Amino acid sequence: MKILKINLLFVILFFISACSSIPSNTSNSCSIFNERYLWFKHASKSEKKWGTPVYLQLAIIKMESGFDWLAKPPRQKLFKVIPYKRPSSSFGYSQAVNGTWEQYKKETGNKLAVRTRFKDSVDFIGWYTSKTESILKISKKDAFRQYVAYHEGWGGFKNYKDNKKIINLAKKVEKQSNIYKKQLLKCGSSLTTNKYIIF
């Protein structure tokens, strides 16, 4: 009985590790989805629901959290030494802040959504980019401007041209989005036909 409990514990720990660990190659969408087939299903569902391309969802997550489910902004430092508070409440795959996450849950009815779950994170990105298209008239295929709005917020978008940092970040997201897109053209059909599940 004791051995059975120990084995069960190892299975649970393995399951948690497999679900939460960062994919080995986050620069390759095919590699990501070969390791995390459920992620492909969730991202595809989000695209079907909101119209936000899978490759843009991935590019935003890579920039925001590096696919780290527990990602948080680094703490600020007092006198460059003493750890201080974090600059924002950003958390999880999508790095959504508390207020926007609560708005998402309220508007979508997804009351049990959590930022550490990939399924909820890509749905959040779909919701946010869809609202960006509605509010700012930015196409969901415009990775550069969609990311600016994602990072700066709908109200802060208008001032981005004076912000070199966000421009450089948005260019990186746009470039990565295009790379993911080309990769998915090569492996998308095989992912669609696969029936097995890889965590």
Where are these regions (language model features)?
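C-terminal motif of bacterial Sec signal peptides marking the signal peptidase cleavage site
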Residues: 17-18
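Catalytic glycan-binding domains that act on GlcNAc-containing polysaccharides
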Residues: 21-192, 198
